[in-house]
């Protein structure tokens, strides 16, 4: 019996250790990156960015039927189990309104990235429809290649270029559109130097030396922004007020618990009717997302009834 990973959502497909033999059958290129831990167990060389990408490719193919997936060099290669957790907890939040998880939810992914990870998981697990926004032209092109390369996804995922790098919802949510939820993995560093320091810490934790290759890729807009995570989410909160009748739940990951108090104050200032925090855990890593709405319980029920 393989050991379970602590803390993952009950519906997460990644509770058990990876079956590397099966994953290598699905994605043969993964085999060249297998290694042994000091305890003699087979593992993946997580210090190698090509190994991490091959693992992601295998996980997406095996668990989510994404046959064709790739990202350009230098873009974030996200851990699939943690991204899946956000989707499952979001599903629970949407299900609280009517007592059932909606099968046809419409979700906006802010900053979908070159990897398009949240829409890929959400479409497979729940049949939702996604709009992915992205400011980076190369990331948008990469995500479109993934969508076009997998039959069926073009009907479920559409992409929009955010032409104003200072905006989040403005220019993306159109006048008569409605979304059950938004989600976002915001840039969390406040400078390029801070982002580099974070990568150094991760590298040391993996036992890499300073000159080793990084698997912690990421373009500037993926890793940092002026003012860091708090400033980014405050902008999101400020913009959300104008779309409070078009979106039922606004949500975003928050990397550090100490960032919550100023965000809660900002939500009070814009008149959010309800604010929810969802705690998550992937192995030793603790994470969370916050959700807010400008609709009361009755308004949310009517919103979902109208959309259906």
UniProtKB/Swiss-Prot annotation:
Please give the superkingdom of this protein's source. Answer: Bacteria
Transmembrane residues, as ranges? none
Q: Which UniProt keywords apply?
A: Cytoplasm, Methyltransferase, rRNA processing, S-adenosyl-L-methionine, Transferase
InterPro entries per the UniProt record, alphabetical: METTL16/RlmF, rRNA_lsu_MeTfrase_F, SAM-dependent_MTases_sf
Q: Which Pfam families match?
A: Methyltransf_10 (PF05971)
Q: What is its main location?
A: cytoplasm
What is catalysed by this protein?
A: adenosine(1618) in 23S rRNA + S-adenosyl-L-methionine = N(6)-methyladenosine(1618) in 23S rRNA + S-adenosyl-L-homocysteine + H(+)
Location of this chain's protein in the cell: Cytoplasm
Example of a GO biological process term: rRNA base methylation
Q: What is its EC number?
A: 2.1.1.181
One GO term in the molecular function aspect is:
23S rRNA (adenine(1618)-N(6))-methyltransferase activity
Q: What Gene Ontology cellular component terms go with this record?
A: cytoplasm
Spell out the residue ranges making up region: Disordered. 190-212
Q: Which family, according to UniProt?
A: Belongs to the methyltransferase superfamily. METTL16/RlmF family.
Q: Which PANTHER family match?
A: RNA N6-ADENOSINE-METHYLTRANSFERASE METTL16 (PTHR13393:SF0), SAM-DEPENDENT METHYLTRANSFERASE (PTHR13393)
According to its UniProt entry, the function of this protein is described as: Specifically methylates the adenine in position 1618 of 23S rRNA.
| Name the record gives this protein | Ribosomal RNA large subunit methyltransferase F
Q: Which organism is it from?
A: Citrobacter koseri (strain ATCC BAA-895 / CDC 4225-83 / SGSC4696)
């Amino acid at each position: 019996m393989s050991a379970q990973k602590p803390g993952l959502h009950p519906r997460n497909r990644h509770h058990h250790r990876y079956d590397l033999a099966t994953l290598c059958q699905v994605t043969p290129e993964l085999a060249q990156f297998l290694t042994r831990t000091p305890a003699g167990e087979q593992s993946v060389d997580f210090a190698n960015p090509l190994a991490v990408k091959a693992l992601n490719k295998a996980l997406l193919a095996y668990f989510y039927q994404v046959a064709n997936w790739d990202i350009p060099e230098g873009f974030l290669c996200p851990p699939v189990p943690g991204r899946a957790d956000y989707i499952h907890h979001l599903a629970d939040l949407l299900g609280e309104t009517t007592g059932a998880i909606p099968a046809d939810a419409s979700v906006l992914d802010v900053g979908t990235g070159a990897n398009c990870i949240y829409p890929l998981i959400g479409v497979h697990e729940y049949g939702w429809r996604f709009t992915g926004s992205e400011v980076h032209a190369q990331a948008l092109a990469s995500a479109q290649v993934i969508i076009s390369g997998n039959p069926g996804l073009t009907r479920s995922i559409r992409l929009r270029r955010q032409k104003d790098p200072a905006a989040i919802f403005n220019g993306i949510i159109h006048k008569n559109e409605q979304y059950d939820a938004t989600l976002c993995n915001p840039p969390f560093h406040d400078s390029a130097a801070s982002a580099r320091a974070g990568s150094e810490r991760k590298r040391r934790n993996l036992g890499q030396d300073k000159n080793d290759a990084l698997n912690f890729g990421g373009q500037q807009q993926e890793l940092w922004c002026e003012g860091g995570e708090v400033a980014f989410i405050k902008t999101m909160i400020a913009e959300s007020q104008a779309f409070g009748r078009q979106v039922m739940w606004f949500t975003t990951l928050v990397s550090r618990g100490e960032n919550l108090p100023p965000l809660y104050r900002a939500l009070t200032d814009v008149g959010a009717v309800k604010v929810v925090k969802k705690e998550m855990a992937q192995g030793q890593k603790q994470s969370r997302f916050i959700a807010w709405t400008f609709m009361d319980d009755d308004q949310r029920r009517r919103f979902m009834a109208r959309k259906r």
